[in-house]
């Protein structure tokens, strides 16, 4: 069975079994809703167990979650650094122009026929996602996921066509 990252447990929160999670999903409200089941993977990416979400709330840049039947810091402290993943069968169908992070990360970015680099990360600073493109011999390029910049996303061919607008690339 395939699993996809939705978050990483970065710390505990208080004494009642809550954990701070750094989310890597656009669907945090759905993934971390009460009753949702996620797979817990250790730092070596080995499956540990399936967990059920007992509660979820947002706090600053973190999602604060609690697992069912784990209500004390001593029970959950060992999970710091572990990843939360969703099973492939639990992924929802997306609308046209929407993609899961695992589909985007690793795609090659082209401007015309020139290879710009490879998408290595997706940031969520505000209204639009920002794709971090790793380039050879240059600093990473930050590309906003907006229509004037991202012209075409071709998942089967692992290719993204872009137009780098003036001001986006400070090395040119």
Swiss-Prot record:
Swiss-Prot/TrEMBL keywords: Chaperone, Cytoplasm, Ribosome biogenesis, rRNA processing
Compartments, as annotated in UniProt: Cytoplasm
Presence of keyword rRNA processing: yes
Predominant location: cytoplasm
GO MF: ribosome binding
GO cellular component term of the entry, any: cytoplasm
Pfam families from the UniProt entry: PRC, RimM
HAMAP family named in the record: Ribosome_mat_RimM
Purpose: An accessory protein needed during the final step in the assembly of 30S ribosomal subunit, possibly for assembly of the head region. Essential for efficient processing of 16S rRNA. May be needed both before and after RbfA during the maturation of 16S rRNA. It has affinity for free ribosomal 30S subunits but not for 70S ribosomes.
Subunit structure as annotated in this protein's UniProt entry: Binds ribosomal protein uS19.
This protein's name: Ribosome maturation factor RimM
Record organism: Streptococcus pneumoniae serotype 2 (strain D39 / NCTC 7466)
Name of encoding gene: rimM
